[in-house]
Amino acid sequence: MVRDSMAAAFRPSNRVLLQALQILVYPGVGGSGSVSCRCPLGAKRYLLTDNVVKLKEFQQKKVAVACNLSGTKETYFRNLKKKLTQNKLILKGELITLLHLCESRDHVELAKNVIYRYHAENKNFTLGEYKFGPLFVRLCYELDLEESAVELMKDQHLRGFFSDSTSFNILMDMLFIKGKYKSALQVLIEMKNQDVKFTKDTYVLAFAICYKLNSPESFKICTTLREEALLKGEILSRRASCFAVALALNQNEMAKAVSIFSQIMNPESIACINLNIIIHIQSNMLENLIKTLKNAAEGNLSKFVKRHVFSEEVLAKVREKVKDVPALVAKFDEIYGTLHITGQVTTDSLDAVLCHTPRDRKSHTLLLNKRMVSRRTFQPLSQSLLAE
């Protein structure tokens, strides 16, 4: 009871959070004016894995739908246009097929009109209904039409059509790739406005967007979202936390950066390792910094043990920091040489390291499970191995 009342007292209200978001995205509404993106453009990498975006599966389904279509695409489009003008009922299957047949901006314009009609006819019967949102956003992803997805997602007449987190996440990822961070933040605002549940991917995207905007306002948003998530009992991923740490460091919020970093479980990723070095640099912990690098360079020599890898950019910052301390410069130069010899230095910037998307674990599992029968005995592999 006491814990619940404390949480309620410290929980940021949606209104306050949304106001902060809107000030950042629409500077004229309030705040201190325009926001400049001070962080380097760096790697414009996607943040979502393939098993979330599912673009390949969508494209395969498009081919299958086109092959199974009775008649031509042009006839199908013409019949749908006729149904629109005659105010006839749009069926679920017709919209699904249409979204799989679209290949151009003009086709998407037709799809948008059909979506408006379909939603107007069915918005009161959405419980358990087919989720068209991800399908439309994947279509926009494929055709490079992110503005169409943003337009529909923000339209109040389509409230409830994009009721799933996947639609918002894929669109934010698409905008992130193109460096349209303010537009991505607008999508985040809309997601918050529509009370769509945030997932682990949402927090990664939200914190990455705030990190790229790199302003006092975006730092405030990131901090508020993080605190709100923790109060709800959400478990934030290591990737999300790394973006939050990097943003705090860029904003010279050292105490916050250290606090967030200390809460990361298993901080052994390349991003964590390099962020830890930056924390040491900005905290002037030079002796510990050199000791950390030395331990990494002289650690277990077994090829089966994963070694720590450091960004050349980060190591350059270390050298700049210790250049006025001759004893430390000598130690660093020796360690630097060892790290290069052992292959523990990458040319990737810290930004590229942060934005790197790990491969899907699911794909590895599928590869392992792909062949379940012995080619020699035609028995299940487990039985075959025992027999041999």
UniProtKB/Swiss-Prot annotation:
Tagged with keyword Mitochondrion: yes
Main location (coarse class): mitochondrion
Renumbered ranges of PPR repeats: 166-200
Keywords: Mitochondrion, mRNA processing, Phosphoprotein
GO terms for biological process, alphabetical: kidney development; liver development; mitochondrion organization; mRNA processing; muscle cell development; regulation of gene expression; regulation of mRNA processing; ventricular cardiac muscle tissue morphogenesis
One GO location term (cellular component): mitochondrion
InterPro entries according to UniProt: mS27/PTCD2, Pentatricopeptide_rpt, PTCD2, TPR-like_helical_dom_sf
Residues with PTM Phosphoserine: S382
Family, similarity comment: Belongs to the PTCD2 family.
PANTHER family referenced in this protein's UniProt entry, alphabetically: PENTATRICOPEPTIDE REPEAT-CONTAINING PROTEIN 2, MITOCHONDRIAL
Name this protein carries in UniProt: Pentatricopeptide repeat-containing protein 2, mitochondrial
Naturally occurring in which organism (per UniProt): Homo sapiens
Lineage: Eukaryota, Metazoa, Chordata, Craniata, Vertebrata
